[in-house]
């Protein structure tokens, strides 16, 4: 952000050991480093603020610390990544120095640093509570796939939408682009505090989409349009793909 300095921004990376499809995911080796360390490296390369990893397992804690990154232990019982990063925030920044919190998922080892930076840009508008990312869908299958979350948004510039709704359905109806939501968030501190204080909302439960809690509470979410979707590692096949991507970058 143009008028923020390094100390204003805190990048938090939640990491959970419990993964049904890929057990021990944070410690999976990618080009000689654990995945969670690769994610922390990408976040550091974004050069937007202090990077802290929020973990729920002593082995992951020790691994991250050994790699030279700041790490904080959090409860195993959190229902969402937002709850985990809020616990971490209270522990590592109790005085409230950080004004903006960027939540980078711990399974995005190939994310481009520029993509991390892009999530902050919507917060340049004082009216925006939460910034996030989106990309135009160019694959017909993705337009109807429930696992591809769509942003229904009103264009406010060539590269930004004001989020009106998020859905797993194919929407909006009619001719025009559809947008895939990328679940990386930048919060104003007060917005994160309010968000976690709210209980799950009606539409959040129905769509299984946490961000709807914010919209139902009247909070504003704007989405920056980016060029690439970061690879989320959820399966062994994803892990192999991530290894190929990072290996190619290193060579």
UniProtKB/Swiss-Prot annotation:
CDD domains: CMP-KDO-Synthetase. Keywords: Cytoplasm, Lipopolysaccharide biosynthesis, Nucleotidyltransferase, Transferase. Pathway: Nucleotide-sugar biosynthesis; CMP-3-deoxy-D-manno-octulosonate biosynthesis; CMP-3-deoxy-D-manno-octulosonate from 3-deoxy-D-manno-octulosonate and CTP: step 1/1; Bacterial outer membrane biogenesis; lipopolysaccharide biosynthesis. It is an enzyme of class 2 (transferase). Its EC number is 2.7.7.38. Activates KDO (a required 8-carbon sugar) for incorporation into bacterial lipopolysaccharide in Gram-negative bacteria. This is 3-deoxy-manno-octulosonate cytidylyltransferase. The lineage of its organism: Bacteria, Pseudomonadati, Pseudomonadota, Alphaproteobacteria, Hyphomicrobiales. The gene is kdsB.
């Amino acid at each position: 952000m143009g008028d923020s300095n390094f100390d204003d921004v805190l990048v938090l990376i939640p990491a959970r050991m419990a993964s049904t499809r890929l057990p021990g995911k944070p410690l999976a080796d990618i080009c000689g480093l654990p995945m969670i360390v690769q994610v922390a490296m990408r976040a550091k390369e974004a050069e937007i603020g202090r990077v802290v990893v929020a973990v729920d397992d002593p082995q992951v804690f020790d691994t991250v610390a050994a790699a030279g990154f700041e790490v904080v232990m959090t409860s195993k019982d959190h229902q969402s990544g937002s709850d985990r990063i809020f616990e971490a925030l209270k522990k590592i920044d109790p005085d409230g120095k950080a004004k903006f919190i960027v939540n980078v998922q711990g399974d995005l080892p190939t994310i481009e640093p520029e993509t991390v930076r892009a999530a902050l840009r919507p917060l340049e508008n004082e009216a925006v509570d939460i910034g996030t990312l989106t990309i135009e869908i160019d694959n017909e299958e993705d337009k109807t796939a429930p696992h591809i979350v769509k942003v229904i948004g009103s264009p406010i510039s060539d590269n930004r939408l004001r989020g009106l709704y998020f859905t797993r359905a194919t929407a909006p109806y009619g001719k025009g682009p559809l947008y895939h939501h990328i679940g990386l968030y930048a919060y104003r501190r007060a917005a994160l505090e309010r968000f976690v204080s709210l209980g799950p909302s009606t539409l959040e439960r129905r769509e299984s989409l946490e961000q709807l809690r914010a919209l139902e509470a009247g909070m504003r979410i704007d989405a920056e349009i980016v060029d690439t979707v970061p690879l989320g590692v959820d399966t062994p096949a994803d892990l192999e793909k991530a290894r190929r991507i990072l290996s190619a970058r290193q060579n």
